A protein has these predicted regions:
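Residues at structural and domain junctions
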Residues: 14-18, 43-44, 91, 106
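...with weaker cross-activation on analogous glycine-rich loops/strands in unrelated enzymes
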Residues: 67-144
């Protein structure tokens, strides 16, 4: 691949601590948007030519915004039994708000059987950026109440209150 064995440690370059909330939201969305067209890779967290899965794309976008949701990491993300989407949904330092109050930069989650299985970034105007398990590349889509076998959670996660 031309990448060192440490490619699993790849992290997007974050904004400085002095960045405003608006700058952070736009950095998060901008990072995800710049990955559109990147291939789907299960357990992938970039860079672009190596691909992403849904939570890897969101995790790198959070890093780009200057957020580091420890103990969730790109290393753990690659573990076969680690569920990054579920961990992001349950992360105690992110705010949960009703779906009807969603804002640009919020995270929209889907779950099946009580387990979160998919995550996307809300862009506004009922649009999201994500990649999915169906092998399609990172892209922009309309939000839907269900996604495959999973249903949207009644709340969204606001990583940048």
């Amino acid at each position: 691949t031309g990448y060192p064995w440490t490619v699993d440690q790849y992290q997007a370059t974050p904004l400085p601590l002095t960045a405003t909330r608006s700058e952070r939201v736009e950095a998060m969305i901008g990072y995800a948007w710049n990955q559109t067209g990147s291939s789907y890779t299960w357990g992938g967290a970039g860079p672009y030519d190596l691909g992403f899965d849904c939570s890897g794309l969101v995790l790198q976008s959070l890093y780009a915004a200057g957020l580091d949701p420890q103990p969730i990491t790109v290393i753990k993300h690659g573990w076969p039994d680690y569920r990054t989407s579920q961990e992001l949904y349950a992360y105690p330092y992110f705010q949960h708000v009703p779906l009807a109050q969603r804002q640009r930069g919020d995270l929209i989650f889907y779950r099946s059987g009580g387990v979160v299985t998919h995550v996307s970034i809300y862009l506004g105007d009922d649009m999201i950026v994500h990649t999915d398990w169906m092998g399609r590349p990172a892209r922009m889509d309309h939000i839907t109440a269900s996604y495959g076998w999973a249903n949207m959670t009644p709340d969204v996660v606001r990583p940048l209150p």
